[in-house]
Amino acid sequence: MTLVPYVVEDTGRGERAMDIYSRLLKDRIVMIGQEITEPLANTVIAQLLFLMSEDPQKDIKVFINSPGGYITAGLAIYDTIRFLGCDVNTYCIGQAASMGALLLSAGTKGKRYALPHSRMMIHQPSGGIIGTSADIQLQAAEILTLKKHLANILSECTGQPVEKIIEDSERDFFMGAEDAISYGLIDKVVSSAKDTKDKDTIS
């Protein structure tokens, strides 16, 4: 069970308690800090859409510390990021693996960051296949389709050729922060909020 801290703020009407994620949302900060599942994706998407409705021009910050997760859930977040009219600054803290790495790369170019000791990893999609021979063939074809689709997205986000993405993704392909710059996953390694283009990361 995950413990969610609460913070207390002084307001004109007295003290008000809120969970830490709601407090961060006030500063247009969204946190992806676990496996990317459908429930998590729905929460993140709702937060992103809420922030867009509040101010369609102001940057949104997405902090990622995730081992990856479900492809459809990750793609739903990815499509929402691309749907937004504002810039999305992405930050890797800890790790951004699999779908986490794809979401990291989906940020606005020039505003994709990683902290110095963070790690990134890309690989091909995987999944257990059960059922009749016809079912197995259909599921295998779907995995191959998703493999090409994800490679095309990463190619667009990183500037790497699709063929290289597919080759590198055959096995777990790990990168440190500096390597991720060369690969095109991120634009800059930062050790302080002052190093980013977003001067109000935390208000």
UniProtKB/Swiss-Prot annotation:
<dbReference type="GO" id="GO:0006515">
    <property type="term" value="P:protein quality control for misfolded or incompletely synthesized proteins"/>
</dbReference>
<dbReference type="InterPro" id="IPR029045">
    <property type="entry name" value="ClpP/crotonase-like_dom_sf"/>
</dbReference>
<comment type="subunit">
    <text>Fourteen ClpP subunits assemble into 2 heptameric rings which stack back to back to give a disk-like structure with a central cavity, resembling the structure of eukaryotic proteasomes.</text>
</comment>
<dbReference type="GO" id="GO:0005737">
    <property type="term" value="C:cytoplasm"/>
</dbReference>
<keyword id="KW-0378">Hydrolase</keyword>
<dbReference type="InterPro" id="IPR023562">
    <property type="entry name" value="ClpP/TepA"/>
</dbReference>
<comment type="similarity">
    <text>Belongs to the peptidase S14 family.</text>
</comment>
<keyword id="KW-0720">Serine protease</keyword>
<keyword id="KW-0963">Cytoplasm</keyword>
<dbReference type="GO" id="GO:0004252">
    <property type="term" value="F:serine-type endopeptidase activity"/>
</dbReference>
<dbReference type="GO" id="GO:0009368">
    <property type="term" value="C:endopeptidase Clp complex"/>
</dbReference>
<feature type="active site">
    <location>
        <position position="123"/>
    </location>
</feature>
<dbReference type="GO" id="GO:0004176">
    <property type="term" value="F:ATP-dependent peptidase activity"/>
</dbReference>
<dbReference type="InterPro" id="IPR001907">
    <property type="entry name" value="ClpP"/>
</dbReference>
<dbReference type="GO" id="GO:0051117">
    <property type="term" value="F:ATPase binding"/>
</dbReference>
<protein>
    <recommendedName>
        <fullName>ATP-dependent Clp protease proteolytic subunit 1</fullName>
        <ecNumber>3.4.21.92</ecNumber>
    </recommendedName>
</protein>
<comment type="function">
    <text>Cleaves peptides in various proteins in a process that requires ATP hydrolysis. Has a chymotrypsin-like activity. Plays a major role in the degradation of misfolded proteins.</text>
</comment>
<feature type="active site" description="Nucleophile">
    <location>
        <position position="98"/>
    </location>
</feature>
<dbReference type="Pfam" id="PF00574">
    <property type="entry name" value="CLP_protease"/>
</dbReference>
<dbReference type="InterPro" id="IPR018215">
    <property type="entry name" value="ClpP_Ser_AS"/>
</dbReference>
<dbReference type="InterPro" id="IPR033135">
    <property type="entry name" value="ClpP_His_AS"/>
</dbReference>
<keyword id="KW-0645">Protease</keyword>
